[in-house]
Amino acid sequence: MAFVWKRLLGTIPSLIGVVVLTFFISHALPGDPAAFFAGPAANAASIENIRATLGLDRPLPVQFLHYVIDLAHGNLGRSLTTGQPVLTDLIERLPASLELSSFALLFAISIAIPMGVWAATRINGGVDHACRGLVTVSAAFPTFFVGLLFVYIFYFLLGWAPQPLGRLNEITFSPPPHVTGAYTVDALIAGDWPVLRAALSQLILPAISLGLFALAPIARITRAAMLEALGSDFIRTARASGLPVRKILMTYAFRNVLLPVSSVLGMVFSFLLGSNVLIEQVFGWQGVGAYAVSAVIASDYAAVQGFVLMMAVLYVLLNLAVDIFAMLVDPRVRYEG
């Protein structure tokens, strides 16, 4: 428990830095939220009245002080684009982004880890070259380009995929009863199989588009860690003892791969949450990424600051989860930390 508290306390300076930088950078962005809120037909006097109502006429340090006081009370402000509290908006949209990122990560893991292990056992062979080629290709193409390409091929040309217009075709299906906010999980809990199939069909293309970019770091780290493990003394001893190859790989070598792979998975998942911004725009996904884009376009300071702060907190929690997992896999981490 002391290990966890030490890690949490160590994140406080980082979160303070995020709050300060996000506030001042968002206020330095071009655009006037008062003018956006007033509309194109508003005159200068109306815009000034709205600016005063929103508190934007105050000096920047005074605005920052009020922002920090509101944060201390759990208030992230009110979004100009939706009219709702930012915290409410983020809570409503976060499950959609987590669902998409989780499926993308599962897709990447299911391909990258077996491929990395297989490539390491056949160094410089056909599988190894194929692995390195796939890693290079998956890292070379932007996620939004892959998403657009998939939409063109699988929806427009072949007609295999549903319309890329969100999480569910709500003309045909109603969302499942809200439990977690993730449609696939909620449909599974409710036992609503038609909605589950419909939600999965909407999820496949964006998850694969996002997951392809995650293949590269996971496969690369898995291959490198497995090569290092296979070249270690204890593996050579196990081979000399006549142990089955499968047991050597899965029981001894793969255990040593878990620590570096788990570390990179935390970073990859946080990256996927950030990359949702582009994929959600392509597929009409109603997540926090699309919300952030709308907020930036409208110079919606409160929404932008809330999004960045939420991402920072999620990143901290992901790293804490990775540290705890590393401690369970290798107790030496507890003492080294």
Identify the residue ranges that each predicted region occupies.
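Alpha-helical transmembrane segments of integral membrane proteins
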Residues: M1-F3, L94-V127, T143, P175-G337
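Residue-level signal for discrete positions within transmembrane alpha-helices
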Residues: T11, R93, S97, G133-A140, ...
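Hydrophobic alpha-helical transmembrane segments of membrane transport/permease proteins
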Residues: S14-L65, F154-V195
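Transmembrane helix irregularities
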Residues: L29, S138-F141, L273
